[in-house]
């Protein structure tokens, strides 16, 4: 097992959540250090997206704590979690089809975006510059993912959560998204990446957690995961 850096951007302890009577998160604990990139892995139904949704307030937790930068955000409403510096890039991207790229990027932007402005987003994703006047429904899946990430960055987060950013993308676009996430990590932004693409996750992340049936079954560095072939075989289908 490997511990995270002392200063934590995210600290989740013994998180429990239910869907009806189904106990879907059973004491999940994980953390992300300031400026660190961490991946949360597991098969479909393992509880990864539910964990993300419980952190941001879309699913109400029924036990445990969530802290961002030391601030308790347990069971807070989504807008309160966002105000604490958490931004989510949701599964499926959710770009507004009838808005332009520029409008999609800036619709939720903060005036004090924590060092992020439109020019910096376009530096990260230069192909979007020529698409600013295009509608969301005119974009490829990869371009929509870039817009979704850029929109989240313009919130000025201290912690960026990404739910399956490679889903539905061609390999070349997966590589481009990975390049961007590495640059974000190198900029000092803390990342928690939910992903089923193991190659992307281990390329971007410094540490990984593996989930199965609502619990954490492995925590360690990417090198430790690679050395633990039984974990990949049992819980990741590899």
Residue locations for each model-derived region?
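Glycine-rich phosphate-binding loops of nucleotide-dependent enzymes
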Residues: 2-238
């Amino acid at each position: 097992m490997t511990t995270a850096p002392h200063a934590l951007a995210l600290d989740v302890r013994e998180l429990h959540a239910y869907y009806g009577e189904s106990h879907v998160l059973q004491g999940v604990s994980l953390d992300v250090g300031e400026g660190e990139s961490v991946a949360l892995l597991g098969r479909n139904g393992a509880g990864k997206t539910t964990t993300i949704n419980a952190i941001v307030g879309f699913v109400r937790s029924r036990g445990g704590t969530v802290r961002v930068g030391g601030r308790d955000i347990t069971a807070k409403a989504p807008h309160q979690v966002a105000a604490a510096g958490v931004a989510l890039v949701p599964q499926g991207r959710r770009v507004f089809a009838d808005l332009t790229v520029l409008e999609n990027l800036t619709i939720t932007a903060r005036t004090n975006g924590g060092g992020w402005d439109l020019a910096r987003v376009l530096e990260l994703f230069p192909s979007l510059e020529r698409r600013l006047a295009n509608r969301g429904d005119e974009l490829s899946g990869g371009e929509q993912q870039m817009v979704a990430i850029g929109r989240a960055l313009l919130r000025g987060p201290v912690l960026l959560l990404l739910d399956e950013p490679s889903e539905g993308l061609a390999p070349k676009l997966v590589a481009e998204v990975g390049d961007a996430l590495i640059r974000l990590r190198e900029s000092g932004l803390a990342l928690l990446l939910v992903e089923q693409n193991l190659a992307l996750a281990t390329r971007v992340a410094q540490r990984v957690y593996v989930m199965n049936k609502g619990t954490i079954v492995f925590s360690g560095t990417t090198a430790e995961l690679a050395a633990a072939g039984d974990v990949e075989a049992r819980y990741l289908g590899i």
